[in-house]
Amino acid sequence: MRMRRKPWARPELEACDFFVANPKENKGNWKNTFKNTENPIYLELGCGKGTFMAVHGSDHPNINYIAIDIKDEVLVLAKRNIEKAYEEKNKALDNVKLMPQEIALIDTILDSNDKIERIYINFCNPWPKDRHKKRRLTHPRQLTKYRDFLVDGGEIHFKTDDDELFEESLEYFKECNFEITYITRDLHNSGYEYNVVTEHEEMFSKQGIKIKFLIAKKL
């Protein structure tokens, strides 16, 4: 369902201290945009309403996070959810940057100098038609871009409800010289300890759909 346009979204975002309106300006220098420049940097591609980032960021002040989505109408909800989580935990909100960016052009805002240590991809569009598969966030065309700014040994954490996307992504990762270090086709019964449930994950689980999850390490 298409989200209704919110004309107030961009003004609210631009008044936010952790919103970055022009991320291209920081390419190669992201560490210096954070208060603690020595923290590792993790990246979430497609942060949605920010449920995942709100929990991760507030639980791990020793990690800096970049959260990306394309629509202001979504980002403004992420902003509010992140602020709420930090306020409830009485944490300083100084380790998250929220920004608008088309993920297909992720290489216009990040490069090898940014040394991203982990990427999260949660419930991305499966693009099931053959002619659209190159749009997948796990497609080799994208993985090649991620490799440029992901450190050696860096990880991609990938969750999905879609069986076909998951199985084909396994081949994508192997093709692009990633090692699968963890895999489960039933995350909620796997015993995996630190799983933050997103809004999509909760919805799919209630429908009886098993959640697939893997960790891929850059070789």
UniProtKB/Swiss-Prot annotation:
This protein's record includes keyword Hydrolase: no
Gene3D superfamilies, A to Z: Vaccinia Virus protein VP39 (3.40.50.150)
Annotated keywords: Methyltransferase, S-adenosyl-L-methionine, Transferase, tRNA processing
One GO MF term attached to the UniProt entry: tRNA (guanine(46)-N7)-methyltransferase activity
One Pfam family matching this protein: Methyltransf_4
Enzyme class: transferase
Biological role stated in the UniProt entry: Catalyzes the formation of N(7)-methylguanine at position 46 (m7G46) in tRNA.
Name assigned to this protein: tRNA (guanine-N(7)-)-methyltransferase
Organism of provenance: Clostridium perfringens (strain SM101 / Type A)
Species classification: Bacteria, Bacillati, Bacillota, Clostridia, Eubacteriales
The encoding gene: trmB
